[in-house]
Amino acid sequence: ELLSSVRAISYASGSKFPSGGLCTAGYCVGNEMTISLLSKIEKHLLLCDNEATAEQYKILANQLPSMNNRIDEAYQNTRDFVNFISKTLPGAKINFVTDDLASLSFKPSVFSLDLPTKGVTDEEREIYKRKLNLRLINLMISQIPNESKFCVSYGQLKGSYWTIPATSTQGTTKEGDKDYIVRVSIAPSINIELHKKVFMEFVTEI
């Protein structure tokens, strides 16, 4: 409704929820006011021979019918895990969607975790936190190797994906602006209770 009176185009990466990570082709959808623009996009795809392949179309056609359910299930798993972390490690700062936004159907399944740190100086606190980040990630992937991965990903069919933006997606960002936090992506198919158990082990160790 907010964008119905202006030209709006939404692009979706096919490697995320549309295909569940099974292909890379993306697609865009526009409202009625973008018809003239969509025809130009179509022309561009044809001129550049950049249209999705038959196999990519097949994968998307098979996966798209379940996409909304997978998005909802992944969100519910993420919300469950976030709530657990909040209770077991109240000193952690968590960046995740609010319940109000989720009620409007904005349901991401990724959150950022700023672990509590300690030390006398800012430098000591930063060094400790960075070590703690790696300690948590290494524990998750060593204890749950079939589901936890140390990489950037989103919208996959199963498992959890752990990364530190400062050393992955923020490679070209100047050092002072990098985020040395933990970013976690949760899939619709996951043993969330096992993840809670391992996270509790981490909490008891620190």
What is each residue range found by the language model?
Residues 1-9:
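Catalytic PLP-binding core of fold-type I/II PLP enzymes
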Residues 8-178, 186-191, 198:
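Active-site C-terminal subdomain of aminotransferase-like
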